Amino acid sequence: GLFSILRGAAKFASKGLGKDLTKLGVDLVACKISKQC
């Protein structure tokens, strides 16, 4: 579910890799939730 995706993204970001990718992912999720995309 969504929570496991967020947890996976947090784990990915905590490695210090793909921070830009993580930010894009978070932006995309926020966009879908607010239906602004």
Swiss-Prot record:
Record key words, sorted: Amphibian defense peptide, Antibiotic, Antimicrobial, Disulfide bond, Fungicide, Secreted
The entry's note on the tissues where this protein occurs is: Expressed by the skin glands.
Kindly list the GO CC terms recorded for this protein: extracellular region
Q: Where in the cell is it found?
A: Secreted
Which Pfam families does UniProt cross-reference here?
Antimicrobial_2
An example GO BP is: killing of cells of another organism
Q: Write down the superkingdom of origin.
A: Eukaryota
Q: What does this protein do?
A: Antibacterial activity against Gram-positive bacterium S.aureus and Gram-negative bacterium E.coli. Has activity against C.albicans.
What is the name of this protein?
A: Esculentin-2B
Naturally occurring in which organism (per UniProt): Lithobates berlandieri (Rio Grande leopard frog)
Lineage from the top down? Eukaryota, Metazoa, Chordata, Craniata, Vertebrata
